[in-house]
């Protein structure tokens, strides 16, 4: 009976001292927004830290189609750019086209006399960057030879033909005199001349076409000279031909002179291509071209450029995000997330930001919860919320500005003899990608660290601002809450929120209540301890009473206890 009485008294005492139960005190807690399921991001100090909100920075998918706006995209269909430039009869439609981006398809093929270009990648890139196949014919004089040679491998309609931008010269009346032709550049722009040399498949074909047993072609300017001798010999048959043509090119600067000297095997130019400098380029892709708008194009299709990074493709054209290896990089756009605890002690008291965040806040990132004689309420603090949002807004734009540039990363090709150069180029490109990937991860981690630090700082600023207002009228409870030692209704709480609280008005009441409560007050952290202590004492007393009863019964003979050894 005594035990039960002690337990009841202790429990009643603890409940009677519950700080939230009186009308002369109030509890004010400061807290921040939280969500049930946050997003994990990386910072400088943590690989994984949960925040309330984050934005993905890596574009990892494409639209699957190439947009034809705002760039002029030219679909090469079955034609390669070099075939269009040379004037393959099957692709005459491309001869006066302009483009920002020329799309070469994997199905493209040559359909004229078989040829090779020793410096194919450079010529392809040069013509692609010009953005046009604008061609100007010139009056070259070729005396003593037959012009306009053709082949059954290159038909225009039903007749044998040849590349329209080249002139195949052969013997005339069993004679092929030495040719010496000059062509000055009197204009104020660079001129691109395309020429070539024919490699017959047999010696008999050589003498039949050019009389001499071996020809020679020399093309010179003031800055350069190329001398090419044909390689006579049989090669694999292509479109009924075992001979080949090698295509070369020469750029003639303003004021310079083009000189051509040959005694056989010359594939002569018919004029020049006007060179232009620009941002035009070429790309291999099988993605369909559609009517849409996108400033970034990859071989996989167009992609949005509203993110600073992408890992869709290394090859891009336009205003594109930087390519990185990571498939995801998340930028924190919210604060540190600490999900709200569903149960906070046996009395269900409200808790501040030091314990956890608050879910369900709709009127701000930071706010107040309070318990007073009018109940338990919550309100947001717009000023501190706006201060944090203002600093976070623009982070994404700043990251994009640091990374997005108007540039195009073209694909690179090398012939087999340039294998070591290709390996070196690949190593350089891979190193650049590794560096950018590392820089991207570091940049995002730094920004995330800054975001979390500044949101924590705004919370601390609000807490210190409240502490300075309350002064000795309240006590810091250590969990982000204040115990206010005077009656504080909703109007009083509102004055604390908006910064108009006058602590002098409540000072006397607070001091009086503080002294009265101090004598009997138990902090909420000790209530559970007292309950456990009272429970333990009760159990101990019950055990003592039970043991005493057993000993008394044994003494009276009502209970016998035999001990056998």
Swiss-Prot record:
According to the Swiss-Prot or TrEMBL entry, at which residues is a lipid covalently attached (S-palmitoyl cysteine)? 554, 561, 564
Molecular function terms in GO for this entry? host cell surface receptor binding
Membrane topology designation: Single-pass type I membrane protein
Membrane side Extracellular: residue ranges: 17-529
PTM summary: Palmitoylated. In natural infection, inactive HA is matured into HA1 and HA2 outside the cell by one or more trypsin-like, arginine-specific endoprotease secreted by the bronchial epithelial cells. One identified protease that may be involved in this process is secreted in lungs by club cells.
Which key words are in the record?
Answer: Clathrin- and caveolin-independent endocytosis of virus by host, Clathrin-mediated endocytosis of virus by host, Disulfide bond, Fusion of virus membrane with host endosomal membrane, Fusion of virus membrane with host membrane, Glycoprotein, Hemagglutinin, Host cell membrane, Host membrane, Host-virus interaction, Lipoprotein, Membrane, Palmitate, Signal, Transmembrane, Transmembrane helix, Viral attachment to host cell, Viral envelope protein, Viral penetration into host cytoplasm, Virion, Virus endocytosis by host, Virus entry into host cell
Task: Report the transmembrane regions from the record.
Answer: 530-550
Signal peptide per UniProt = 1-16
Assembly and partners are described as:
Homotrimer of disulfide-linked HA1-HA2.
Role summary: Binds to sialic acid-containing receptors on the cell surface, bringing about the attachment of the virus particle to the cell. This attachment induces virion internalization of about two third of the virus particles through clathrin-dependent endocytosis and about one third through a clathrin- and caveolin-independent pathway. Plays a major role in the determination of host range restriction and virulence. Class I viral fusion protein.
Write down what this protein is called. Answer: Hemagglutinin
Give the source species. Answer: Influenza A virus (strain A/Equine/Miami/1/1963 H3N8)
Gene name of the record: HA
């Amino acid at each position: 009976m005594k035990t039960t009485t002690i337990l009841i008294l202790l429990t009643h005492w603890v409940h009677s001292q519950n700080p939230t139960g009186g009308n002369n005190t109030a509890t004010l807690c400061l807290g921040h927004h939280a969500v049930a399921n946050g997003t994990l991001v990386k910072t400088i100090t943590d690989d994984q830290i949960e925040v309330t909100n984050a934005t993905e920075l890596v574009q990892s998918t494409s639209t699957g189609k190439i947009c034809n706006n705002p760039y002029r995209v030219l679909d090469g269909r079955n034609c390669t750019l070099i075939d269009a430039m040379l004037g393959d009869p099957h692709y005459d439609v491309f001869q006066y086209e302009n483009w920002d981006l020329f799309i070469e398809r994997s199905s493209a093929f040559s359909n004229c006399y078989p040829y090779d270009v020793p410096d194919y990648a450079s010529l392809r890139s040069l013509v692609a960057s010009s953005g046009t196949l604008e061609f100007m014919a010139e009056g070259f004089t070729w005396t003593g030879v037959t012009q306009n040679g053709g082949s059954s491998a290159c038909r225009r309609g039903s007749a044998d033909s040849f590349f329209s931008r080249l002139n195949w010269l052969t013997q005339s009346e069993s004679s092929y005199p030495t040719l010496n032709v000059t062509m000055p550049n009197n204009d104020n722009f660079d001129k691109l001349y395309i020429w070539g040399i024919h490699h017959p498949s047999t010696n008999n074909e050589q003498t039949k076409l050019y009389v001499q047993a071996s020809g020679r072609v020399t093309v010179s300017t003031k800055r350069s000279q190329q001398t090419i001798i044909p390689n006579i010999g049989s090669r694999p048959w292509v479109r009924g031909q075992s001979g080949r043509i090698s295509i070369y090119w020469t750029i003639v600067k303003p004021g310079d002179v083009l000189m051509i000297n040959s005694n056989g095997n010359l594939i002569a130019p018919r004029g020049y291509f006007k060179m232009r400098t620009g941002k035009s380029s070429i790309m291999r892709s099988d993605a369909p071209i559609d009517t849409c708008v996108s400033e970034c194009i990859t071989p996989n299709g167009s992609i949005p450029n509203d993110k600073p990074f992408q890992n869709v493709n290394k090859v891009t054209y336009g205003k594109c995000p930087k390519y990185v290896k990571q498939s995801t990089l998340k930028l924190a756009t919210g604060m540190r997330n600490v999900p709200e605890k569903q149960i906070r002690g046996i009395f269900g008291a409200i808790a501040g930001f030091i314990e956890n965040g608050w879910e369900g806040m709709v009127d701000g990132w930071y706010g107040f919860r309070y318990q007073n004689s009018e109940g338990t309420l919550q309100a947001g603090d717009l000023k501190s919320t706006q201060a944090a949002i203002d600093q976070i807004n623009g982070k994404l734009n700043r990251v994009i500005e640091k990374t997005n540039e108007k540039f195009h990363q073209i694909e690179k090709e090398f012939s087999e003899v340039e294998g070591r150069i290709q390996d070196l180029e690949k190593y350089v490109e891979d190193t650049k990608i590794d560096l950018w990937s590392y820089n991207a991860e570091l940049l995002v981690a730094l920004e995330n660290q800054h975001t979390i630090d500044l949101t924590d700082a705004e919370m601390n600023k609000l807490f210190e601002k409240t502490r300075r207002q309350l002064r000795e009228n309240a006590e810091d409870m250590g969990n982000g809450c204040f115990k206010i030692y005077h009656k504080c209704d909703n109007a009083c709480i509102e004055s604390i929120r908006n910064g108009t609280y006058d602590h002098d008005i409540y000072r006397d009441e607070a001091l009086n209540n503080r002294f009265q409560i101090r004598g009997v007050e138990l902090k909420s952290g000790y209530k559970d301890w007292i309950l456990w202590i009272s429970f333990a004492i009760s159990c101990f007393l019950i055990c003592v009473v039970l043991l005493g009863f057993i000993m008394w019964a044994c003494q009276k003979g009502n209970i016998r206890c035999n001990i056998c050894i």
